[in-house]
């Protein structure tokens, strides 16, 4: 069985996923494409030599008889409508973050999927598929160094451009930590606060950088997440879980060490694509394989997208108010409580 994809959005991430499905992964094929810029969509089909039709809009693409699964890589505010259309048509859907730009939008998707009666949606939280995070998750789940007490992590970028506004530090950057930490320690968030140290001289006037986000879980785990998007030295992701009997840390990226002029060092990546390229491959292959094997995706689901949205909204309020914000989630439906094969179980 080949899973036939229709792609909504042919920007940078959309093109990368299309190349991935056509050239690197097994079991998938691009058969339909659409974009607000029709010429761009046609150009992609021509350049990649795809056997795919270009549709005038997302609705017509979703309705196409030869589309089994919809890949949503459109503009963030369009995701909600794209996903709801796919669910209405009974099509599987892989959607890049965010699932929706509001918690209310996420809830609409959750209700639509539950009414359909089976899982159709997977959200593109790719860090769960990163080899290092997978190893860290296994170490945590094995409990061989006790229960988690604290987590320290950092998300550092060399620099950002003028289009990067202050809110993006939460909704575009911290959002990755919000999801992966929720998955790593398997505990619900209770509150969030944000503090701002001295501002770096490299930050543009409109941006507060760096910032430290403190999350507390219902189980009492205290998480500090540094967001520093103008650190200059490289793209650096850190995570350290302090346990009752030891510490588990995210492995460093593989790199040769060098000795030169009385210096011993290693290279640091400058780009997120290099850091997580394999994780993108694994998450989409897992999406394809899960559907072929069980008839449902088993990766990050619509509920995970809702948790991320609620938590990010609270973190943004904390950033702007200077006050701790409590995180109030609706009760998790049993529909999303059934254990599926997780990425780390499939990879280890």
Swiss-Prot record:
Keyword set, alphabetical order: NAD, Oxidoreductase
Record InterPro entries: Gfo-Idh-MocA_inositol_DH, Gfo/Idh/MocA-like_OxRdtase_C, Gfo/Idh/MocA-like_OxRdtase_N, MI/DCI_dehydrogenase, NAD(P)-bd_dom_sf
Signal sequence range: none
One of the GO BP terms on file: inositol catabolic process
Catalysed reaction, written as an equation: myo-inositol + NAD(+) = scyllo-inosose + NADH + H(+); 1D-chiro-inositol + NAD(+) = scyllo-inosine + NADH + H(+)
Pathway: Polyol metabolism; myo-inositol degradation into acetyl-CoA; acetyl-CoA from myo-inositol: step 1/7
Statement: the UniProt record of this protein carries the keyword NAD: yes
Keyword Cytoplasm appears in the UniProt entry: no
Enzyme class, spelled out: oxidoreductase
PANTHER family named among the record's database cross-references: INOSITOL 2-DEHYDROGENASE, PTHR43593
Protein name per its UniProtKB record: Inositol 2-dehydrogenase/D-chiro-inositol 3-dehydrogenase
């Amino acid at each position: 069985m080949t899973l036939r994809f229709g792609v909504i959005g042919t920007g940078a991430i959309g093109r990368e996923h299309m190349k991935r499905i056509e050239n690197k992964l097994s079991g998938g094929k691009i058969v339909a494409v659409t974009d607000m810029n029709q010429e761009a969509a046609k150009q992609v089909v021509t350049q990649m030599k795809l056997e795919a039709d270009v549709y005038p809009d997302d609705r017509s693409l979703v309705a196409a008889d030869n589309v089994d699964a919809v890949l949503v890589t459109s503009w963030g505010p369009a995701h909600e409508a794209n996903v709801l259309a796919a669910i209405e048509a009974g099509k599987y859907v892989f959607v890049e973050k965010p699932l929706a730009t509001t918690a209310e939008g996420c809830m609409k998707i959750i209700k639509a999927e539950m009414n359909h009666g089976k899982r159709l949606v997977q959200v593109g939280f790719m860090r769960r598929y990163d080899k290092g995070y997978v190893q860290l998750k296994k170490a945590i789940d094995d409990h061989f160094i006790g229960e988690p007490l604290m987590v320290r992590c950092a998300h550092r970028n060399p620099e950002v451009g003028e289009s990067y506004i202050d809110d993006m530090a939460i909704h575009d950057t911290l959002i990755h930590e919000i999801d992966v930490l929720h998955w790593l320690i398997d505990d619900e968030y209770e509150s969030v606060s944000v503090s701002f140290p001295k501002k770096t001289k490299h930050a543009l006037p409109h941006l507060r950088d760096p910032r430290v986000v403190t999350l507390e879980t219902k189980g009492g785990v205290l998480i500090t997440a540094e967001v520093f998007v103008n650190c200059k030295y490289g793209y650096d992701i850190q995570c350290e879980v302090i346990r009752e009997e030891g510490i588990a840390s995210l492995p460093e990226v593989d790199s040769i060490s060098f000795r030169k002029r009385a210096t011993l060092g290693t290279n640091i990546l400058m780009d997120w694509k290099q850091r997580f390229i394999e994780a993108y491959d694994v998450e989409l292959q897992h999406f394809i394989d899960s559907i072929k094997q069980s008839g449902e995706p088993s990766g990050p689901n619509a509920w995970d997208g809702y948790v991320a949205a609620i938590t990010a909204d609270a973190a943004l309020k904390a950033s702007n108010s200077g006050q701790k914000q409590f995180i109030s989630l609706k009760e998790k439906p049993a529909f999303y409580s059934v254990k599926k094969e997780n990425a780390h179980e499939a990879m280890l």
